[in-house]
């Protein structure tokens, strides 16, 4: 049974975009949380 590479070709850009978005949002969220914790202290 051969693997259908068309699925990988279609999903690859979606996975890359999603991981890039999670990385950027995660970095911004961490900065916001750190700023909030710094204000509390």
Curated annotation (Swiss-Prot):
Keywords from the UniProt entry: Membrane, Photosynthesis, Photosystem II, Thylakoid, Transmembrane, Transmembrane helix
The keyword Glycoprotein is annotated on this UniProt entry: no
Entry's localization field: Cellular thylakoid membrane
Sample GO molecular function, one term: manganese ion binding
The organism's place on the tree of life at top rank: Bacteria
GO-annotated biological processes: photosynthesis
InterPro entries recorded: PSII_PsbY (IPR009388)
UniProt membrane topology term: Single-pass membrane protein
Keyword Membrane assigned: yes
Coiled-coil regions listed in the entry: none
Transmembrane segments: 7-25
Cellular component GO terms, alphabetical: photosystem II; plasma membrane-derived thylakoid membrane
Subunit structure and binding partners: PSII is composed of 1 copy each of membrane proteins PsbA, PsbB, PsbC, PsbD, PsbE, PsbF, PsbH, PsbI, PsbJ, PsbK, PsbL, PsbM, PsbT, PsbX, PsbY, PsbZ, Psb30/Ycf12, peripheral proteins PsbO, CyanoQ (PsbQ), PsbU, PsbV and a large number of cofactors. It forms dimeric complexes.
Family to which this protein belongs: Belongs to the PsbY family.
Role summary: Loosely associated component of the core of photosystem II (PSII), it is not always seen in crystals. PSII is a light-driven water plastoquinone oxidoreductase, using light energy to abstract electrons from H(2)O, generating a proton gradient subsequently used for ATP formation.
Stated name of the protein: Photosystem II reaction center protein Y
Organism the protein comes from: Nostoc punctiforme (strain ATCC 29133 / PCC 73102)
